[in-house]
């Protein structure tokens, strides 16, 4: 017959709990990862002094910004705009020399239909592609020149095989609007923020134009999926960039 367990008062100092057991509330996380979700003021000093690099490698501050505000008429054949056009100068919106790094891109605005189109029963999806052009030359290539589509459908667009080494899709997204008398959704908000760390190189010209790029131009391609009903996009696109140290 098994003996009864001794009273707890007599077992003081003779704990049966294994010393190797881990009852830490953080589970089996490494100590390095346990501080990730903690506020900066509650982290150890070494984590406060070794913060992540705000400034991209090889660049120097301050962080500069350039905005592109425009209303776009988007159709099935697509549209393109260059969002790395930065003029050379000394301001907070200018580049100092030939080289700079676009750290992030912020796109916000809305997609909408006019009064005549929104009364028709249809659904229209607007698709966006953020593309890096590694070897820009002349003028930006049209949507149909860069992308290969099945049955002229932008939702099936992929970069053509012979252009894959030059054009790289960094991000893509879409938004949808619906017209009609009952289930109408005539506008859709757009808000995207991406880290890209794209190193842009210009030639000796000062003007911020696509034709003055020599490496890594950023292009935004837009197209809608409905053949007969175009839509409008009122967008504000901001790029945040740093000048290169080697300028």
Curated annotation (Swiss-Prot):
Residue positions of motif Bipartite nuclear localization signal: 3-20, 191-238
Domain of life: Viruses
Chief localisation class: virion
Keywords: Capsid protein, DNA-binding, Host nucleus, Host-virus interaction, Metal-binding, T=1 icosahedral capsid protein, Viral penetration into host nucleus, Virion, Virus entry into host cell, Zinc, Zinc-finger
GO BP of this protein: symbiont entry into host cell; viral penetration into host nucleus
A single Gene Ontology CC term: host cell nucleus
Pfam families for this protein: Gemini_coat (PF00844)
Single Gene Ontology MF annotation: DNA binding
Intervals of motif Nuclear localization signal: 31-45
Position of sequence motif Nuclear export signal: 92-113
Annotated localization: Virion; Host nucleus
Function: Encapsidates the viral DNA into characteristic twinned ('geminate') particles. Binds the genomic viral ssDNA and shuttles it into and out of the cell nucleus. The CP of bipartite geminiviruses is not required for cell-to-cell or systemic movement.
Family, as annotated: Belongs to the geminiviridae capsid protein family.
Known partners and oligomeric status: Homomultimer. Binds to single-stranded and double-stranded viral DNA. Interacts (via nuclear localization signals) with host importin alpha-1a.
Name assigned to this protein: Capsid protein
